[in-house]
Amino acid sequence: SLAFRQGMIAIASGIYDMVIIGGVEKMAHDSTERVTEGIASAADSLLEVGIGATFPSLFALIANRYFHEYGDVREAMAVAAVQNHANAYLNPDAQLRKLITVDDVKNGLPVADPFTVYDCSLVSDGAVFIVLAASDIAEKLNPKRAVKILGSGHAGDTLTTYGKKSLTTLAATVKAADQAYKMSGKSAKEIDLVELHDCFTITQVI
Protein backbone atom coordinates (compact mmCIF):
# COMPACT_ATOMS: atom_id res chain seq x y z
CA SER A 1 0.00 0.00 0.00
CA LEU A 2 2.90 2.36 0.67
CA ALA A 3 4.36 1.66 -2.78
CA PHE A 4 0.93 2.39 -4.28
CA ARG A 5 0.74 5.73 -2.50
CA GLN A 6 4.30 6.67 -3.46
CA GLY A 7 3.58 5.82 -7.08
CA MET A 8 0.41 7.90 -7.01
CA ILE A 9 2.26 10.87 -5.52
CA ALA A 10 5.05 10.55 -8.09
CA ILE A 11 2.50 10.85 -10.90
CA ALA A 12 0.44 13.59 -9.23
CA SER A 13 3.59 15.66 -8.71
CA GLY A 14 4.52 15.39 -12.38
CA ILE A 15 7.81 13.60 -11.74
CA TYR A 16 6.57 10.60 -13.74
CA ASP A 17 3.57 9.97 -15.96
CA MET A 18 3.62 6.19 -15.52
CA VAL A 19 5.03 3.84 -12.89
CA ILE A 20 4.89 0.14 -12.09
CA ILE A 21 4.68 -0.80 -8.44
CA GLY A 22 4.91 -4.24 -6.95
CA GLY A 23 5.25 -6.39 -3.92
CA VAL A 24 6.55 -9.93 -3.49
CA GLU A 25 6.42 -12.34 -0.57
CA LYS A 26 7.91 -15.83 -0.55
CA MET A 27 7.62 -17.76 2.70
CA ALA A 28 5.98 -21.12 2.00
CA HIS A 29 9.28 -22.82 1.15
CA ASP A 30 10.68 -22.45 4.66
CA SER A 31 9.94 -24.15 7.97
CA THR A 32 7.23 -22.92 10.33
CA GLU A 33 9.89 -22.07 12.90
CA ARG A 34 11.91 -19.93 10.47
CA VAL A 35 8.83 -18.14 9.15
CA THR A 36 7.55 -17.48 12.67
CA GLU A 37 10.93 -16.04 13.60
CA GLY A 38 11.03 -13.88 10.49
CA ILE A 39 7.56 -12.44 10.99
CA ALA A 40 8.28 -11.83 14.67
CA SER A 41 11.18 -9.59 13.69
CA ALA A 42 8.59 -6.89 13.05
CA ALA A 43 7.82 -6.83 16.77
CA ASP A 44 10.02 -5.54 19.59
CA SER A 45 13.04 -7.87 19.62
CA LEU A 46 13.76 -7.33 23.31
CA LEU A 47 10.51 -6.88 25.18
CA GLU A 48 8.23 -9.01 23.00
CA VAL A 49 10.17 -11.50 20.88
CA GLY A 50 12.80 -11.72 23.61
CA ILE A 51 10.29 -13.30 25.98
CA GLY A 52 8.97 -15.71 23.37
CA ALA A 53 6.10 -13.71 21.88
CA THR A 54 4.98 -14.52 18.34
CA PHE A 55 2.53 -12.65 16.16
CA PRO A 56 -0.28 -15.13 16.90
CA SER A 57 0.29 -14.65 20.63
CA LEU A 58 0.46 -10.85 20.33
CA PHE A 59 -2.76 -10.67 18.34
CA ALA A 60 -4.31 -13.11 20.81
CA LEU A 61 -3.55 -10.53 23.52
CA ILE A 62 -5.34 -7.95 21.39
CA ALA A 63 -8.31 -10.30 20.97
CA ASN A 64 -8.57 -10.94 24.69
CA ARG A 65 -8.41 -7.23 25.44
CA TYR A 66 -11.17 -6.69 22.88
CA PHE A 67 -13.25 -9.35 24.66
CA HIS A 68 -12.64 -7.57 27.97
CA GLU A 69 -13.87 -4.23 26.65
CA TYR A 70 -16.63 -5.25 24.24
CA GLY A 71 -17.58 -8.82 25.07
CA ASP A 72 -16.73 -12.16 23.52
CA VAL A 73 -16.79 -11.89 19.72
CA ARG A 74 -15.65 -15.43 18.89
CA GLU A 75 -18.82 -15.91 16.85
CA ALA A 76 -18.05 -12.87 14.68
CA MET A 77 -14.44 -14.02 14.32
CA ALA A 78 -15.60 -17.46 13.21
CA VAL A 79 -18.03 -15.96 10.71
CA ALA A 80 -15.17 -13.90 9.26
CA ALA A 81 -13.09 -17.06 8.79
CA VAL A 82 -16.00 -18.88 7.15
CA GLN A 83 -16.61 -15.95 4.82
CA ASN A 84 -12.96 -15.73 3.80
CA HIS A 85 -12.76 -19.45 3.07
CA ALA A 86 -15.97 -19.23 1.04
CA ASN A 87 -14.43 -16.45 -1.05
CA ALA A 88 -11.27 -18.51 -1.57
CA TYR A 89 -13.34 -21.52 -2.60
CA LEU A 90 -14.64 -19.52 -5.57
CA ASN A 91 -11.10 -18.80 -6.76
CA PRO A 92 -9.45 -21.69 -8.67
CA ASP A 93 -6.03 -20.20 -7.88
CA ALA A 94 -6.59 -19.91 -4.13
CA GLN A 95 -4.00 -21.44 -1.84
CA LEU A 96 -6.60 -23.37 0.15
CA ARG A 97 -9.99 -24.11 -1.40
CA LYS A 98 -11.95 -25.54 1.50
CA LEU A 99 -15.38 -24.65 2.82
CA ILE A 100 -15.58 -24.53 6.59
CA THR A 101 -18.27 -23.92 9.20
CA VAL A 102 -18.42 -21.82 12.34
CA ASP A 103 -18.08 -25.02 14.37
CA ASP A 104 -14.97 -25.98 12.39
CA VAL A 105 -13.40 -22.67 13.37
CA LYS A 106 -14.33 -22.91 17.03
CA ASN A 107 -13.19 -26.53 17.31
CA GLY A 108 -10.03 -26.16 15.24
CA LEU A 109 -6.55 -26.89 16.51
CA PRO A 110 -5.62 -24.30 19.17
CA VAL A 111 -2.87 -21.81 18.31
CA ALA A 112 -2.98 -19.05 20.94
CA ASP A 113 -6.12 -18.52 22.98
CA PRO A 114 -8.65 -17.55 21.66
CA PHE A 115 -7.31 -18.42 18.18
CA THR A 116 -7.64 -21.76 16.48
CA VAL A 117 -5.85 -22.59 13.26
CA TYR A 118 -8.73 -21.14 11.21
CA ASP A 119 -8.39 -17.76 12.90
CA CYS A 120 -4.86 -17.41 11.49
CA SER A 121 -3.83 -16.62 7.94
CA LEU A 122 -1.75 -19.09 5.97
CA VAL A 123 1.95 -18.73 5.31
CA SER A 124 1.95 -17.86 1.64
CA ASP A 125 3.83 -16.99 -1.50
CA GLY A 126 2.45 -14.12 -3.52
CA ALA A 127 3.16 -11.20 -5.77
CA VAL A 128 1.28 -8.27 -7.22
CA PHE A 129 2.19 -5.57 -9.71
CA ILE A 130 0.09 -2.57 -10.68
CA VAL A 131 0.55 -0.04 -13.47
CA LEU A 132 -0.25 3.52 -12.44
CA ALA A 133 -0.54 6.22 -15.07
CA ALA A 134 -1.65 9.81 -15.48
CA SER A 135 -5.34 10.05 -16.39
CA ASP A 136 -4.81 10.95 -20.04
CA ILE A 137 -2.42 8.05 -20.58
CA ALA A 138 -4.60 5.55 -18.72
CA GLU A 139 -7.60 6.47 -20.86
CA LYS A 140 -5.61 5.88 -24.03
CA LEU A 141 -4.09 2.59 -22.92
CA ASN A 142 -7.15 0.81 -21.57
CA PRO A 143 -10.22 2.97 -21.00
CA LYS A 144 -12.43 0.00 -20.07
CA ARG A 145 -10.18 -1.19 -17.26
CA ALA A 146 -8.75 2.11 -16.04
CA VAL A 147 -9.66 2.83 -12.42
CA LYS A 148 -9.51 6.38 -11.12
CA ILE A 149 -7.90 6.96 -7.73
CA LEU A 150 -10.14 9.34 -5.81
CA GLY A 151 -8.34 9.27 -2.49
CA SER A 152 -5.47 7.77 -0.57
CA GLY A 153 -4.21 7.83 2.98
CA HIS A 154 -1.20 6.67 4.93
CA ALA A 155 -0.43 6.67 8.63
CA GLY A 156 1.85 4.87 11.05
CA ASP A 157 1.70 3.55 14.57
CA THR A 158 4.00 1.65 16.89
CA LEU A 159 4.25 -2.06 16.14
CA THR A 160 4.61 -2.90 19.82
CA THR A 161 1.55 -3.98 21.76
CA TYR A 162 2.71 -2.21 24.91
CA GLY A 163 3.28 1.08 23.09
CA LYS A 164 -0.23 1.45 21.72
CA LYS A 165 -2.70 3.80 23.38
CA SER A 166 -5.42 1.23 22.76
CA LEU A 167 -5.29 -2.41 21.73
CA THR A 168 -8.88 -2.43 20.54
CA THR A 169 -8.51 -0.13 17.56
CA LEU A 170 -6.11 0.15 14.64
CA ALA A 171 -5.14 3.80 15.00
CA ALA A 172 -3.10 4.00 11.80
CA THR A 173 -5.94 2.47 9.78
CA VAL A 174 -8.40 4.99 11.19
CA LYS A 175 -6.10 7.90 10.34
CA ALA A 176 -5.35 6.62 6.84
CA ALA A 177 -9.03 6.02 6.13
CA ASP A 178 -9.92 9.53 7.31
CA GLN A 179 -7.29 10.96 4.96
CA ALA A 180 -8.64 8.96 2.03
CA TYR A 181 -12.25 9.94 2.78
CA LYS A 182 -11.31 13.61 3.01
CA MET A 183 -9.29 13.53 -0.20
CA SER A 184 -12.01 11.71 -2.14
CA GLY A 185 -14.98 13.57 -0.72
CA LYS A 186 -16.60 10.22 0.01
CA SER A 187 -17.87 8.60 3.20
CA ALA A 188 -17.84 5.03 4.47
CA LYS A 189 -21.52 4.66 3.52
CA GLU A 190 -20.61 5.22 -0.14
CA ILE A 191 -18.07 2.39 -0.28
CA ASP A 192 -19.33 -0.81 -1.94
CA LEU A 193 -16.26 -3.02 -1.61
CA VAL A 194 -13.56 -3.19 1.06
CA GLU A 195 -10.50 -5.43 1.11
CA LEU A 196 -9.26 -5.93 4.65
CA HIS A 197 -5.96 -7.17 5.98
CA ASP A 198 -6.97 -10.27 7.90
CA CYS A 199 -3.80 -11.77 9.36
CA PHE A 200 -6.05 -12.90 12.21
CA THR A 201 -9.83 -12.85 12.41
CA ILE A 202 -9.80 -10.30 15.24
CA THR A 203 -8.27 -7.71 12.90
CA GLN A 204 -11.24 -8.09 10.59
CA VAL A 205 -13.65 -7.61 13.49
CA ILE A 206 -11.78 -4.54 14.76
Where are these regions (language model features)?
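Metallocofactor- and cofactor-centric catalytic cores in central/energy metabolism, strongly enriched
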Residues: 5, 75, 87-91, 99-101, ...
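Active-site-proximal alpha-helical scaffold in enzymes
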Residues: 1-25, 57-90, 130-136
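Condensing-enzyme catalytic core mediating Claisen C-C bond formation in acyl metabolism
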Residues: 45, 78-79, 110-179, 183
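Phosphate/pyrophosphate-binding loops at sites that engage ATP/ADP/AMP, CoA/4′-phosphopantetheine
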Residues: 67-71, 176-190
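Conserved catalytic cysteine-centered active-site region
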Residues: 1-19, 26-58, 96-122, 157, ...
